[in-house]
């Protein structure tokens, strides 16, 4: 009888990818995935530490799991093995055992390949096991072959960690220094997912355009080199990459957006702030004019490219003028979609110890204003698509029986009513008939 594995994933797409790999890792040891936490023999929380709210969600979920464990005990069942993985594990370590002593294993994002051994020790009644080593090579060398198919669109991790040390960010402390997988590893995994009917590959990294992986004859490949290499794979129709840092947008990568048809015309390029003063305080290593220059060059390379970004409001020392500079940048760039957040001080980062923290009510007010402008731009872009024909990759079922959902080249969700489920996994021409803030509606031509 197989054992059941339940994984709950928080945060970024890198965590989503890691969770798939954890499933692959544990499958040979008899663990099959379940979506029902109540039947799980192992419960893994793959966590995010980017903001305080995200971290506290982990502890709230652990509280619910404790109640579940008590219920199992009352029913005469063995308790599930509880694992906290990911960035909260890396950042808080032994503190997790102090706050939640019923947790069995704490494992960082670079160490989860050791989970089979750690789990076997818990089965032998060892307690409070922890592995927070930063050995990126070991992680990637020990990743299993792809077992669980991700579907029509697949994530592949090519780079981890970050050397930028932005003063608001915990990534260098939780994911470690920048490390790139070899071209051979990435290519082999790409071939595997395409053989399982993936049509789109999204290359992942905390700073993906800093990729410098070893290729044939020890040649170092840039991200542009890697994308060109992967574009040669038959039956692979779309390529994307995320998340990028402006200072690593090289000439060859920008030019590739104009020459490689498989590279989608949508780029997530976070700027965080439109104020030169705040950009400097954040240690972003560029100013607003540098960012504008990259945007202009991308649009020269490919006129139909659409941009996305991240913004943080209320960073320590942010004045009304600084916030107005951010609004000005947003209005000048005109984004297709964006993510925006209030600054959240993270322990151990330089921003957290500054004495000029912004009051919460001011951060909330600024976020509301910014999100209103971003929503206006997003809706305007979506409405501009009405009446056009777009190539949509259908990758999932909708809520209703005859509904399927796909993605445009610009990452917009498109809903159609069509009982023909054979369209799933295919790229189809769709005429867009209706636009909302977060989605489009269309009809098959």
Swiss-Prot record:
<dbReference type="GO" id="GO:0035597">
    <property type="term" value="F:N6-isopentenyladenosine methylthiotransferase activity"/>
</dbReference>
<feature type="binding site">
    <location>
        <position position="169"/>
    </location>
    <ligand>
        <name>[4Fe-4S] cluster 2</name>
    </ligand>
</feature>
<dbReference type="Pfam" id="PF01938">
    <property type="entry name" value="TRAM"/>
</dbReference>
<keyword id="KW-0411">Iron-sulfur</keyword>
<keyword id="KW-0819">tRNA processing</keyword>
<dbReference type="InterPro" id="IPR006463">
    <property type="entry name" value="MiaB_methiolase"/>
</dbReference>
<keyword id="KW-0479">Metal-binding</keyword>
<keyword id="KW-0004">4Fe-4S</keyword>
<keyword id="KW-0808">Transferase</keyword>
<keyword id="KW-0963">Cytoplasm</keyword>
<comment type="subunit">
    <text>Monomer.</text>
</comment>
<dbReference type="GO" id="GO:0046872">
    <property type="term" value="F:metal ion binding"/>
</dbReference>
<feature type="binding site">
    <location>
        <position position="162"/>
    </location>
    <ligand>
        <name>[4Fe-4S] cluster 2</name>
    </ligand>
</feature>
<dbReference type="InterPro" id="IPR005839">
    <property type="entry name" value="Methylthiotransferase"/>
</dbReference>
<feature type="domain" description="Radical SAM core">
    <location>
        <begin position="148"/>
        <end position="380"/>
    </location>
</feature>
<feature type="binding site">
    <location>
        <position position="166"/>
    </location>
    <ligand>
        <name>[4Fe-4S] cluster 2</name>
    </ligand>
</feature>
<dbReference type="InterPro" id="IPR007197">
    <property type="entry name" value="rSAM"/>
</dbReference>
<dbReference type="Pfam" id="PF00919">
    <property type="entry name" value="UPF0004"/>
</dbReference>
<dbReference type="Pfam" id="PF04055">
    <property type="entry name" value="Radical_SAM"/>
</dbReference>
<comment type="similarity">
    <text>Belongs to the methylthiotransferase family. MiaB subfamily.</text>
</comment>
<dbReference type="GO" id="GO:0005829">
    <property type="term" value="C:cytosol"/>
</dbReference>
<dbReference type="GO" id="GO:0051539">
    <property type="term" value="F:4 iron, 4 sulfur cluster binding"/>
</dbReference>
<dbReference type="InterPro" id="IPR020612">
    <property type="entry name" value="Methylthiotransferase_CS"/>
</dbReference>
<dbReference type="InterPro" id="IPR038135">
    <property type="entry name" value="Methylthiotransferase_N_sf"/>
</dbReference>
<dbReference type="InterPro" id="IPR013848">
    <property type="entry name" value="Methylthiotransferase_N"/>
</dbReference>
<comment type="function">
    <text>Catalyzes the methylthiolation of N6-(dimethylallyl)adenosine (i(6)A), leading to the formation of 2-methylthio-N6-(dimethylallyl)adenosine (ms(2)i(6)A) at position 37 in tRNAs that read codons beginning with uridine.</text>
</comment>
<dbReference type="InterPro" id="IPR023404">
    <property type="entry name" value="rSAM_horseshoe"/>
</dbReference>
<feature type="binding site">
    <location>
        <position position="87"/>
    </location>
    <ligand>
        <name>[4Fe-4S] cluster 1</name>
    </ligand>
</feature>
<feature type="domain" description="MTTase N-terminal">
    <location>
        <begin position="3"/>
        <end position="124"/>
    </location>
</feature>
<dbReference type="InterPro" id="IPR006638">
    <property type="entry name" value="Elp3/MiaA/NifB-like_rSAM"/>
</dbReference>
<keyword id="KW-0949">S-adenosyl-L-methionine</keyword>
<feature type="binding site">
    <location>
        <position position="48"/>
    </location>
    <ligand>
        <name>[4Fe-4S] cluster 1</name>
    </ligand>
</feature>
<keyword id="KW-0408">Iron</keyword>
<feature type="binding site">
    <location>
        <position position="12"/>
    </location>
    <ligand>
        <name>[4Fe-4S] cluster 1</name>
    </ligand>
</feature>
<protein>
    <recommendedName>
        <fullName>tRNA-2-methylthio-N(6)-dimethylallyladenosine synthase</fullName>
        <ecNumber>2.8.4.3</ecNumber>
    </recommendedName>
</protein>
<feature type="domain" description="TRAM">
    <location>
        <begin position="383"/>
        <end position="445"/>
    </location>
</feature>
<dbReference type="InterPro" id="IPR002792">
    <property type="entry name" value="TRAM_dom"/>
</dbReference>
């Amino acid at each position: 009888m197989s054992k059941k594995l339940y994984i709950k994933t928080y945060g970024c797409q890198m965590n989503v990818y890691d969770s798939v790999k954890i499933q692959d890792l544990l499958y040979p040891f008899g663990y099959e995935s379940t979506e029902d936490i109540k039947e799980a023999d192992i419960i893994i929380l793959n966590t995010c530490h980017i903001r305080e709210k995200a971290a506290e969600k982990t502890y709230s979920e652990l509280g619910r799991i404790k109640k579940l464990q008590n219920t199992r005990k009352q029913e005469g069942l063995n308790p599930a093995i509880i694992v906290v993985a990911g960035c909260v594990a890396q950042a808080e370590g032994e503190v997790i055992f102090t706050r939640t002593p019923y947790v069995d294993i704490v494992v960082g994002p670079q160490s989860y390949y050791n989970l089979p051994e750690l789990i076997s020790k818990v089965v032998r009644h060892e307690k409070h096991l922890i592995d927070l080593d930063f050995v990126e090579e070991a992680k990637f060398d020990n990743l299993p072959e792809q077992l669980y198919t991700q579907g029509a669109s697949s994530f592949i991790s090519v780079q981890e960690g970050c050397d930028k040390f932005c003063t608001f960010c915990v990534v260098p402390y939780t994911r470690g220094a920048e490390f790139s997988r070899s071209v051979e590893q990435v290519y082999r995994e790409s071939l595997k997912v395409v053989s399982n009917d993936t049509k789109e590959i999204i290359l992942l990294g905390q700073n993906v355009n800093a990729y410098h992986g070893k290729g044939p004859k020890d040649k170092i490949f840039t991200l542009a080199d890697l994308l060109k290499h992967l574009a040669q794979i038959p039956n692979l129709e779309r390529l994307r990459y995320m998340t990028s840092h402006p200072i690593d947008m090289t000439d060859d990568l920008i030019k590739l957006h104009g020459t490689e048809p498989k590279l989608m015309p949508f780029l997530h390029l976070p700027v965080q702030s439109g104020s030169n003063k705040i950009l400097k305080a954040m240690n972003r290593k560029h100013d607003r004019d540098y960012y504008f220059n990259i945007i202009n060059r991308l649009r020269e390379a490919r006129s139909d490219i659409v941009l996305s970004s991240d913004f943080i409001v209320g960073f320590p020392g942010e004045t009304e003028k600084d916030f107005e500079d951010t609004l000005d940048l947003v209005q000048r760039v005109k984004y297709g979609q964006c993510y925006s957040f209030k600054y959240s001080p993270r322990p151990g980062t330089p921003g957290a110890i500054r004495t000029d923290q912004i009051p919460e009510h001011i951060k909330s007010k600024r976020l509301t204003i910014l999100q209103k402008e971003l929503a206006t731009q997003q809706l305007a872009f979506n409405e501009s698509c009405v009446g056009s024909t777009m190539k949509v990759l259908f990758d999932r079922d909708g809520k209703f029986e005859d509904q399927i959902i796909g993605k445009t080249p610009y990452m917009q969700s498109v809903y159609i009513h069509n009982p023909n489920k054979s369209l799933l996994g295919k790229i189809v021409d769709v005429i867009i008939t209706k636009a909302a803030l977060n989605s489009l509606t269309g009809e098959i031509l």
